[in-house]
Amino acid sequence: MLRFAITLFAVITSSTCQQYGCLEGDTHKANPSPEPNMHECTLYSESSCCYANFTEQLAHSPIIKVSNSYWNRCGQLSKSCEDFTKKIECFYRCSPHAARWIDPRYTAAIQSVPLCQSFCDDWYEACKDDSICAHNWLTDWERDESGENHCKSKCVPYSEMYANGTDMCQSMWGESFKVSESSCLCLQMNKKDMVAIKHLLSESSEESSSMSSSEEHACQKKLLKFEALQQEEGEERR
C-alpha cells in the first residue's frame, strides 16, 4: 500500500513538473528529472530540480558553506538547527514543486509557500539557542566582491531575533514562506508532503485565502491513511 502512495506521488510530481518546470536559479535545472545518486535531499531524488553533485555541499556536518553563503558566521549551527535549515535549502534547490510558488517578480525565487505551523514551531525550537546576525537571510548580509556573505549586525540568539516559529518562518527567507491556517494543506518537508501537494495543486486556481473545507477534509483523511500505512510499513520491517 505504501508503494501505491509513492507511485501516486510520482504521478503527481510528473504532472506538476510538466506545468511548472523548475525555478530559474543558478543551480536549478530547466526541468526536473531523476537523481538516484543524491547525497542529501533524497526526498526529491525521483524528480529533482537540482543535480546530485550540488547535494555534496549538504552531505557532511557541520555545513560550512552552500554555494557562496556561509552558514557559520555566528558559529556552527547545532545539528538540530542545521537539519531544519537543510530541509529548507533542499526544498528551494531540489523540489520539483517549488516553482508552483514562483515569485513573478524574480523567477529564481519562491513566494508564500505554505508551511505547517508544527514545522515552524519545531524549527524554531531546534534553533532558538543558536546565533544569527541576519533577520532576512536573503537580503540582510554584506556581500563582498565574490558574493560571499558577512554580518552587518551583531550575532544574537534566534530567540532574540525572532519572536516565535511563525515570525521566523515568515521572516528568515523574506516572503518565501507563510504559515498555513491548515494543518494538512501545508508542507512539512518530509514524505507527508505527497499528500498535501495533491490537494494544494487542486486549489492552485483559487485565492490562497479561500481554503476549501472539502479539500481540507479530504487532505486530513488521506493524511491519516498515509500515516497508518507508514506505521504498518515500519512494523513489517521489524
Curated annotation (Swiss-Prot):
Q: What is the effect of changing residue 31 to K?
A: In 30% of egg-white and yolk
Output the PTM entry. Plasma and yolk RBPS have the same carbohydrate components, whereas egg-white RBP has a different, ovomucoid-type carbohydrate chain.
Modified residues annotated as Pyrrolidone carboxylic acid in this record = 18
Keywords, sorted A to Z: Disulfide bond, Glycoprotein, Phosphoprotein, Pyrrolidone carboxylic acid, Signal, Transport
Q: List the disulfide bonds.
A: 22-49, 41-90, 50-94, 74-155, 81-127, 116-186, 120-169, 133-151, 184-219
Any one GO CC term of this protein is:
external side of plasma membrane
| Residues annotated as signal peptide | 1-17
Q: Is Cell cycle there in the keyword field?
A: no
Q: Which residues get modified to Phosphoserine?
A: 204-205, 208-210, 212-214
Q: Which GO terms describe its molecular function?
A: riboflavin binding; riboflavin transmembrane transporter activity; signaling receptor activity
Q: Which residues are glycosylated?
A: 53, 164
**Source organism, top-level taxon:** Eukaryota
Q: In which tissues is it expressed?
A: Yolk RBP is synthesized in the liver; egg-white RBP is synthesized in the oviduct.
GO biological process, any: negative regulation of sensory perception of bitter taste
Q: Which family does it belong to?
A: Belongs to the folate receptor family.
This molecule's function is given as: Required for the transport of riboflavin to the developing oocyte.
The name on file for this protein is: Riboflavin-binding protein
